[in-house]
Amino acid sequence: MTGLFITLEGPEGAGKSTNRDYLAERLRSEGIEVVLTREPGGTPLAERIREVLLAPGEEQMNPDTELLLVFAARAQHLAEVIRPALARGAVVICDRFTDSTYAYQGGGRGLSLARIATLETFVQGDLRPDLTLVFDLPVEVGLARASARGRLDRFELEGQAFFDAVRTAFLTRAAAEPERYYLLDAAQPLAHVQQAIDALLPTLLERARG
């Protein structure tokens, strides 16, 4: 039995974590086994890598170092959490996955997309999400929400141009593969966003039950 792999993507302040929890609750209420996780992170080792990636520091991190750390955490996450859960037929809901790598390291940092694709194949093989929800909103709105949460991490401290490139990368990927991506307007009130998620539930339940 093969499970269902759902990823949630979008820029800072888009409400991914809140809506990840909401979607998981709705699926669990229907008797579906759900594994909630996040990237970078998801295992004790990968969470330590996350701390290195997100913590501001005196030494500037080289973009290639950043990219390799992201995929190192992902390799551990896949081996310990994602692949075993999918193998037993669970629904895996992950807050960020490889689309964020293309958006942040590819779009924001300007790294080679071909290099990212090579690492993607090396680490993931042919594993790709079955469905990706992209929570889109204007950059300035997302950054204001992130600032309101309190202390900013290393990525949240980046400027407008960085996040403009990140948003463009997400939208470009969603437009190129509409059968996998579902775009949501995250600038709406939360209740409206969750109504859009509810509209997906019948399809998700059908796929989760095989």
UniProtKB/Swiss-Prot annotation:
Keywords: ATP-binding, Kinase, Nucleotide biosynthesis, Nucleotide-binding, Transferase. It is an enzyme of class 2 (transferase). InterPro entries: P-loop_NTPase, Thymidylate_kin-like_dom, Thymidylate_kin_CS, Thymidylate_kinase. ATP binds at G10, P11, E12, G13, A14, G15, K16, S17. Its EC number is 2.7.4.9. One of its GO terms (molecular function) is dTMP kinase activity. GO terms for biological process: dTDP biosynthetic process; dTTP biosynthetic process; dUDP biosynthetic process. It catalyses: dTMP + ATP = dTDP + ADP. One of its GO terms (cellular component) is cytosol. Belongs to the thymidylate kinase family. Phosphorylation of dTMP to form dTDP in both de novo and salvage pathways of dTTP synthesis. NCBIfam families: DTMP_kinase. This is Thymidylate kinase. It comes from Pseudomonas fluorescens (strain SBW25). The gene is tmk.
